[in-house]
Structure formats: structure tokens, C-alpha cells
């Protein structure tokens, strides 16, 4: 089943490093060039579901000087596999769309 837009962005934000909630929101905005904004309610509702499903794990604060109330999240092994599967699915969708509407990939 396809991932929701919010879930996909959260997993992409966690793919490169562990992040706290605000860090996830900033990374989502950066990766999408500001086109997708993830609010706190959407973020934390989704994070709780991802934690419950074993897709994301909580970890201890990054360093001793870090605010102990700050919670850091990371992709689980299962979450990394799920993200890879979703990326492959989306690549297939784009490939199929290009065949049907005859769009050529842009060249840099």
C-alpha cells in the first residue's frame, strides 16, 4: 500500500540521520524546497503511528548538553526497507507515466 505524503516525507527526513521533531519539520521543508510544510500535529500523529508499527524508533538525546525533553527518532531496519520499497514503487509510477504522456526526463 502506498505511503501517505506526510509519512513519505518523514521517512525521507530520517533516511540520512536521526532527528528530533523540529529537525524533521525543517528537513522536510528543505527537501521539498518549501513546497511541503509539515505541521506539529501531523508530524507527531504520524510519528506515533510509525513508532507503534516499528517503522521508526526513538533514541536517546544526541549529546549530554542536549535538552533531555528532546526526543530523537531514527528509521528502523524495517523502516529503511519500507522506504526503499516505496521509492521503487514511485519510480515505477513515474516510468509508466512517462511512457503514456511521452515526457522525457530533463537533462542537467
Predicted regions and their residues:
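N-terminal helix-turn-helix DNA-binding core of bacterial DNA-binding proteins
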Residues: 1-42
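Beta-hairpin "wing" of winged helix-turn-helix
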Residues: 51-68, 74
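Short, well-ordered turn and helix-capping elements at secondary-structure junctions
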Residues: 28, 32, 60-62, 77-79
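Residue-level signal for threonine
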Residues: 4, 75-76
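Amphipathic alpha-helical dimerization/coiled-coil segments
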Residues: 78-108
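Basic amphipathic alpha-helical segments that dock to polyanions
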Residues: 43-50
